[in-house]
Amino acid sequence: MFSNQYIQQRIHKANSLREEGKNPYQNGLKRSLTNAAFLEKYAYVKGLEEPKDKEKCESIVGRVKLLRLMGKACFIKVEDESTILQVYVSQNELNDEFKSLKKHLEVGDIVLVKGFPFATKTGELSIHALEFHILSKTIVPLPEKFHGLSDIELRYRQRYLDLIVNPSVKDVFKKRSLIVSSVRKFFEMEGFLEVETPMMHPIPGGANARPFITYHNALEVERYLRIAPELYLKRLIVGGFEAVFEINRNFRNEGMDHSHNPEFTMIEFYWAYHTYEDLIELSKRLFDYLLKTLNLDSKIIYNDMEVDFNQTSVISYLDALETIGGISKDILEKEDRLLAYLLEQGIKVEPNLTYGKLLAEAFDHFVEHQLINPTFVTQYPIEISPLARRNDSNPNIADRFELFIAGKEIANGFSELNDPLDQLERFKNQVAEKEKGDEEAQYMDEDYVWALAHGMPPTAGQGIGIDRLVMLLTGAKSIKDVILFPAMRPVKNDFNVESEE
């Protein structure tokens, strides 16, 4: 693993430090200020007649990003989590320690510097070193500074390198953290209680998806990594909680692309005595809150598309197919005509698809990508909404919506089905679909039906994909750009290093 000549040179330097009685992996030394705090606290130094303040002494830490050796002195750029600070080191102060530093220090090493603030002739506020310690010797050279880390695959597989070399990547994940904490704060302010439900399920449910399967040794049973927390959260509504939410991982054993990762984060929330129309208004308030928290304008650019949050609209499923998808009513209203139309358009349609699934195929191909501004699409076919409440006026549609922004689904919500007999029949229909070969059809969950039979109040529930939300609000083009360690196809580890020093 460490046979490369450049790595061997660095290992030799680490051993040389040990021979001098220095630990190349020190512990216990503390900084007094972050680099940003140092620059803020001592900004006044640049205005002094003699731009230095020897009475002040601070300790800073970070990774060496740039090293310029000049005989009896050197300038070093040291970066902590957020800020680069220049360090000046002179043989006059460090004596023999300076020789050791010149011999052993390299770009990538993590250091602690103790010294006083001063400004260079060019006016750059810096720290003049009185002590210098290598805290962690880097034995693998970092990618070259000016070209960064451009190999996309390597960036995802070795995210630590990506974070070191590309500061903008770190900014994305800081924004992700802010988005998640802001979503949590919003729901707490709205009176929702955060809960945690199981990650391993005896029966996968809550979504139409293929599960990951594991085995519980102590119980001697198969378990499924959860595809959604929905059925457990609704059990809590049965139990008497009236507003709950959960932010956590879901796992779906399916394909991967720029907007799908098999392990992803969602928020799901359930609200007793409310309807899906209430969820639409709640979602609008959530986005207003997030835009304000992130200091974003109501108009944002995503993938070269202008998204205007002031132009939010609501449209029914069939109206969207007609007015946006361009499919006439006489085609949409007849199953055989719709099938013929899809085939004429060159769309591969699986045999024996139900009318509702044919409508879904048409929607996916002709409508979804055109929904740029926030669009709540309502009145979904009941056949593709097995957990949603049946509409009182039209039993063929569900009291359900999906929110689309920038051509992608961001949220799914509905008035919940709380009739246990209807739910049992829909589960039976899903089982029949699974027996026909639909791997994503839902399983029968009699325990959930039994819970419903104890009475669940009228409830509205919704899920929002956190990863897609972060993509939208940060401008990331791939879901891999907003997940620190995304799923990747296995490759043989290649630890070879070509020095870029």
From Swiss-Prot:
User: Any idea which positions bind Mg(2+) 1?
Assistant: 402, 409
Q: Per the UniProt entry, what are the Gene Ontology biological process annotations, in alphabetical order?
A: lysyl-tRNA aminoacylation
S-adenosyl-L-methionine among keywords: no
| Cofactor(s) recorded in Swiss-Prot or TrEMBL | Mg(2+)
- In terms of superkingdom, the source organism counts as Bacteria
Going by the UniProt record, its keywords in alphabetical order are: Aminoacyl-tRNA synthetase, ATP-binding, Cytoplasm, Ligase, Magnesium, Metal-binding, Nucleotide-binding, Protein biosynthesis
Q: Which reaction does it catalyse?
A: tRNA(Lys) + L-lysine + ATP = L-lysyl-tRNA(Lys) + AMP + diphosphate
The parts of the chain that form a coiled coil are none
Q: Which SUPFAM superfamilies match?
A: Class II aaRS and biotin synthetases (SSF55681), Nucleic acid-binding proteins (SSF50249)
Primary location? cytoplasm
Pfam family name, one: tRNA-synt_2
Localization per Swiss-Prot or TrEMBL: Cytoplasm
**Cofactor note as given:** Binds 3 Mg(2+) ions per subunit.
Q: Which residues bind Mg(2+) 2?
A: 409
Q: What is its EC number?
A: 6.1.1.6
Annotated GO molecular function terms are: ATP binding; lysine-tRNA ligase activity; magnesium ion binding; tRNA binding
Instruction: State whether it acts alone or in a complex, and with which partners, per the record.
Output: Homodimer.
Q: Which family does it belong to?
A: Belongs to the class-II aminoacyl-tRNA synthetase family.
Record HAMAP family? Lys_tRNA_synth_class2
> In its UniProt entry, what is this protein called?
Lysine--tRNA ligase
Q: What species was this sequence derived from? A: Helicobacter pylori (strain ATCC 700392 / 26695) (Campylobacter pylori)
Gene name as annotated: lysS
